[in-house]
Amino acid sequence: MARYDVIIAGGEVLDPANNRQEIADVGISGGKVIEVAPDLDRSDAGEVIDAEGQWVMPGLIDTHVHVAGTRSTWDPAMGHRMLVEAGTTTALDFGGTPEGLIGGIQRMGAGLNIGGLFGMVPESTIPKDDPPPAAVRDIVDDALTRGAMGIKML
């Protein structure tokens, strides 16, 4: 049995958290990086991905994306693909409803660590003029029940 499921071979590894920038191989097993070193034994991998001339780095985090969209014609799966292709592995959506976000995940598969915030926008998601505290509590409770991770006040 191969030690690594995948080796990403010969790329320029950029890892600021560990002060690393070097040409190296990245050994992955069980979905986790288990070793980073020059010249890992490629015969000990189920798959080898040639990354020569490419950067290899931890996934990016985008804390304000609009993958769920607000228009009925917007397909959240397209936003998911765009994020993954750009190297993003974790994203907080701030562009649509929890249902839209979940619908995109169901069609595309997650592929990302993704969560959504509910925006409290006067004249859009909350009344324009000074809503009573009980109304705001109800709106927040509803958003959290529908799957929002948090609330952003605008």
What is each stretch, according to the model?
Residues V6, L40, T63-H64, E85:
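General secondary-structure edge motif
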Residues P16-A17, G69-R71, T125-P127:
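A generic structural signal for short coil/turn motifs at secondary-structure boundaries
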Residues W55-V56, D75-L154:
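Divalent-metal coordination cores built from histidine and acidic residues
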Residues Q54-P76:
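Di-metal (Zn2+ and/or Mg2+/Mn2+) metal-binding site signature of metallo-dependent hydrolases
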